[in-house]
């Protein structure tokens, strides 16, 4: 765990933006979640988390960009904005996720029969929704909650959680 106002010296030395996550692999240092995720998928390609075909890979990258630009931006407003800004962002995030909820019911994972990097990108946001005060009911809630359950029950997802993340939903241990 890294405190934003007190980053460790090795992070300062490795990463000029001092952001987390930061990955060091041999002589390479990377930061920014999506860059790290794509690198790891290429470094450890079995099973692949990005589609094999270039068009599908491009579409996946667009989905991840949209998730970042639209939903992670709203999450940031919820966490760091004023009370009224947070309330508006919370409402917008809930409405946008419910609006695309049918997508979550079409296939086991995000527009795919296979777990993909898009799911990896979306999962941390969805995991934090209760902490952010975003809850679902009504049309679309069943599909969205079903998708979340499928992702959150994966051994790989559970193994990826830090202790603070685990405590967000699971309590201690």
Please provide the spans of the model-predicted regions.
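GST-like domain detector, emphasizing the conserved glutathione-binding G-site
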Residues: 1-102, 108
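Acidic/histidine-enriched, glycine/proline-rich intrinsically disordered or flexible terminal extensions
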Residues: 163-173
């Amino acid at each position: 765990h890294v405190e934003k106002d007190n980053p460790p010296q090795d992070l300062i030395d490795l990463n000029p933006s001092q952001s987390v996550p930061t990955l060091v692999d041999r002589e390479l240092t990377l930061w920014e979640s999506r860059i790290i995720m794509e690198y790891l998928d290429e470094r450890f390609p079995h099973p692949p988390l990005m589609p094999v075909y270039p068009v599908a890979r491009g579409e996946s990258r667009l989905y991840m960009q949209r998730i970042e630009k639209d939903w992670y931006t709203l999450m940031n407003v919820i966490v760091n904005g004023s009370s009224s800004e947070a309330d508006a962002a919370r409402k917008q995030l809930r409405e946008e996720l419910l609006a695309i909820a049918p997508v979550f019911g079409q296939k086991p994972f995000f527009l795919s029969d296979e777990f993909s990097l898009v799911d990896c990108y979306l999962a941390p946001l969805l995991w934090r929704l209760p902490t952010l005060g975003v809850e679902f009911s009504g049309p679309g809630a069943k599909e969205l909650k079903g998708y979340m359950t499928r992702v959150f029950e994966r051994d790989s997802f559970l193994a990826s959680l830090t202790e603070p993340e685990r405590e967000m939903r699971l309590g201690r241990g």
